[in-house]
Amino acid sequence: MGKFEDDGNSESVPLTRQRSESLASQTSTDSGLSIASESFMKNHKGGNTMPTDGGDGDRYLDVEDGGETGLDEPLISSGTKTGSSSRLRKIVWLLVLLCVGGWVLSFVLFLTQKRPDTAALSSASTVEIHEPGPATGGTSHGKPVTLEQVLSGTWSPKSHAISWIAGPDGEDGLLVEQGEKQDAFLRVKDIRSSEDGVDNLETRVLMKKGYIWFDGEAMLSAKTWPSPDMNRVLVMTDIQSNWRHSYFGKYWILDVATQKAEPLDPGNLSGRVQLAAWSPTSDAVVFVRENNLYLRKLTSLEVTPITKDGDENLFYGVPDWVYEEEVFSGNTGTWWSDDGKFVAFLRTNETAVPEYPIQYFRSRPSGKQPPPGLENYPEVRQIKYPKPGSPNPIVNLQFYDVEKNEVFSFEMPEDFVDDERIIIEVVWASEGKVLIRETNRESDVVKIFVMDTKARTGKLVRSDDIAALDGGWVEPTQSTRVIPADPKNGRPHDGYVDTVIYEGYDHLAYFTPFDNPEPVMLTKGNWEVVNAPSAVDLKKGLVYFVATKEAPTQRHVYSVKLDGSDLRPLTDTSAPGFFDVSFSHGAGYGLLSYKGPAVPWQAVINTQGDEIDFINLIEENVELAKMVEESAIPTEVYSNVTIDGYTLQVLERRPPNFNPEKKYPVLFFLYGGPGSQTVDRKFTIDFQTYVASNLGYIVVTVDGRGTGFIGREARCLVRGNIGHYEAIDQIETAKIWASKSYVDESRMAVWGWSYGGYMTLKVLEQDAGETFQYGMAVAPVTDWRFYDSIYTERYMHTPEHNPSGYANASIDDVMALGHSVRFLIMHGVADDNVHLQNTLVLIDKLDLKNIDNYDMQVFPDSDHSIQFHMAHALVYERLSSWLINAFNGEWHRTANPKPQEST
């Protein structure tokens, strides 16, 4: 189900695992620049001075849970997301006190009393809320958050897309910006200060306009990739989406000096290219067209075919659907060696993979018109989609010798057999060596190979049996960093930094030489690194990474030396925070992104000293901060509950003007996929915010067992039986909330999208109407035998090895679903990820048992995100109106309809 890509709308993210998609060290050749980034706004001098959060401290509260606050959040009033003026707040409260002083005094006395809410189950921890003063309702002033604002992106923080690039002579501190400035659409800036003792390079404009001219026609740029020497730019136009991460387009080579463009392949102007990448030496481009790999040397207008037999079943250099979605979360399967002499690429044979038909009733994504007489038939796209137990694509790694114009491959000792192998990472090292990471089909054995392309030999350097270690699995990651030998700096051998399992948590380890089975552990403790490492400064011998060291819900940036000493934070850990970072080519500079809990900001930092220095604050989101001041934002209460000995993170969103003497309906929002995370400290204004702010309902989210960043024991417990423990944790937490004095236990609902849709149905099935009366499931899996093999078998094994687990995990007890008051199911008809088959099979089960307490809506031609014909807005409008009807009791009236007498 791909990596968990948090785009600020997590409920619509397809079935994924959480990886907190770091901006880790993007270079200009990693991905095309497609988002505008304006020039720097402010210059900050003064050492390690963070931009201030500002604002009142009552939007969210930390909650003590049975004396276990040390497990996550400190028992303090944490930072804020509001950014409003504290002086103005004092004036407002003074006026309130003058007007209703006696009432406020009695209210404060009431609130300062400890009022424990007894848990419904003895296995769950008692929660005591400690509220700092009378501001229990949070920001009650202002206008409620509207659904239109959420859907239009009005509440989305602004962020800037910049990519780092090494200078022609390896200079650090150069970044590529793309924007709309006059005659400076794409430019390279040198952010190094004269204080660093370097001569700054002049800002260089690579592309003056956001379009190119060729043969009298202007074509708008969709993506751009500067060459490493910055003399040319690879430009893509006419982009056409394929799957979630892949696309087609026309590619051009723009000469920076003349600003003239030529086709990537002058002999084929109409060809749709799937992928193109510069050589590190800037003298060639490798590209994929119609699943074949080609090379264009800039000294010639001719292209050289590297492969010739690519077709609809045989892919070269690009992943097929399942590898794109579940392994790489991207569109590339091609990797240049650092010296530009070799190209490594995947050969994917999916001949044996069964097809699944995707039907389109209102559109024709192929762009082709049907033959006469067939206009009234839907277009059908057959995709190769391996389901659990069915044949997977057979993937091998091949190499191309640029000088010899030769394709070759060679056997690796102790390799997996073809139908067991999943290649999850390819990393070039020095002198023609390359690291290959593979897993078996069920993703519980990982092997690391080192291949020597010059000697054409391979060696197994590491093998980890994850199933034997903790019964879990390994996630496909692409963050390994090669550390080249440097005897002068104490590194006699090549090595690499990798994430490994250490004492039940994900930590960083340094392996040197490659085949050393005993690594240097760089991090240790009851916390985890995230998509690490982020970067390595080879000059200083420092490894930078993001981790949950302060709390599972937080992210801070740290550094540690290659010998494992001197681990220190780069960000302020004295208050809750959620940071991300991307580093420059040499890791001397970085783009630091603060994502919450206050209004997000971005700054360029200098990491060359003992402490970080802020160079430029490039985004403060001033307008967003003003919106927060003027809006009625829910109070967020962070706490944790303990279920069966596991401490789980909980977020409660309380409506503005929250009154503890009232009875509120409660909506549980969940995702719950293996390794995912929904409760975090990011600034988020989403559908859940709208529900609390505008509809006045309480919204609760709990990350149950199986989710990420609370240790592998809690995560791996769900293997082979997904849905079971996760549903228990939602139900147990819901019973705790149902017992609270301010909750109406007769009005409780649960909702989710994708894996969250599956979990919604699983919760309703296991609960059987005891706790939850309502549920809303969007694009749900209902039987894991219907989902793709690589994702499902990672957590469930194959159906052959675990038939009872698949049976237990399916939504099968429809009689239990019938005990809820009502539930809603929505699905896109053209969903290539979670097929409509899931919903249709469940509907048939309901029909067979005459269960009719549900509503269903499908969206023609919409995929997993449900976007076709503006359907995304329709989904949320339906969720909102359906929930209002539920909590208003309308579905009780429809349960046993009676005819009215005629008048």
Curated annotation (Swiss-Prot):
It is found in: Vacuole membrane. Pfam families: DPPIV_N, Peptidase_S9. One of its GO terms (molecular function) is serine-type peptidase activity. It catalyses: Release of an N-terminal dipeptide, Xaa-Yaa-|-Zaa-, from a polypeptide, preferentially when Yaa is Pro, provided Zaa is neither Pro nor hydroxyproline. Keywords: Aminopeptidase, Glycoprotein, Hydrolase, Membrane, Protease, Serine protease, Signal-anchor, Transmembrane, Transmembrane helix, Vacuole. The keyword Nuclease does not apply. The chain crosses the membrane at residues 91-111. Its EC number is 3.4.14.5. This is Probable dipeptidyl-aminopeptidase B.
